[in-house]
Amino acid sequence: MGDEEKRNRAITARRQHLKSVMLQIAATELEKEESRREAEKQNYLAEHCPPLHIPGSMSEVQELCKQLHAKIDAAEEEKYDMEVRVQKTSKELEDMNQKLFDLRGKFKRPPLRRVRMSADAMLKALLGSKHKVCMDLRANLKQVKKEDTEKERDLRDVGDWRKNIEEKSGMEGRKKMFESES
């Protein structure tokens, strides 16, 4: 067993040594990578950013600041215009995709919620914001005059039989019945 223990210790020591060597190599590689990135950054800045010439007088510095602000404003306007264009095209794409699904018969079904909505609002939601449709559902209905016909009177009279029975029920009703017969 003594021989085997020595051998196991030697193997463990060798593993530890190899690990430490690998860690040292990795550390040097990381340092090289960091220095390479820093050099690339410096080269990019030197290439794309012109060196800043600071003039001697205060008015020249202010003029330089105004020029830089004008460039910033122009870049911001361009950025805003691009964002608006992107939003507009994405909205058009969504509308076209919805029309495509409608034409194919495959609807993307959103999760449904109960919403009280008028017919106009529903059509606006279905057709999109570009289409203006006004729909008055009551306009197509014909007007009906209420006529008091004989049939309706008969139906009302038939409805009154309950009242008659309620009046005749109980002692007072029977008393009235006898009084009316005599």
From Swiss-Prot:
Keywords: Acetylation, Actin-binding, Disease variant, Muscle protein, Phosphoprotein. Pfam families: Troponin. It comes from the Eukaryota. The modification Phosphothreonine is found at residue 12. The modification N-acetylglycine is found at residue 2. The keyword Transferase does not apply. Residues 97-117 are annotated as: Involved in binding TNC and actin. GO terms for molecular function: actin binding; troponin T binding. One of its GO terms (biological process) is positive regulation of DNA-templated transcription. GO terms for cellular component: cytosol; nucleus; troponin complex. Residues 2-48 are annotated as: Involved in binding TNC. The modification Phosphoserine is found at residue 118. The keyword Nucleotide-binding does not apply. InterPro entries: Troponin, Troponin_I, Troponin_sf. Troponin I is the inhibitory subunit of troponin, the thin filament regulatory complex which confers calcium-sensitivity to striated muscle actomyosin ATPase activity. Binds to actin and tropomyosin. It is linked to Arthrogryposis, distal, 2B1: A form of distal arthrogryposis, a disease characterized by congenital joint contractures that mainly involve two or more distal parts of the limbs, in the absence of a primary neurological or muscle disease. DA2B is characterized by contractures of the hands and feet, and a distinctive face characterized by prominent nasolabial folds, small mouth and downslanting palpebral fissures. DA2B1 inheritance is autosomal dominant. PANTHER family: TROPONIN I, TROPONIN I, FAST SKELETAL MUSCLE. Belongs to the troponin I family. This is Troponin I, fast skeletal muscle. It comes from Homo sapiens.
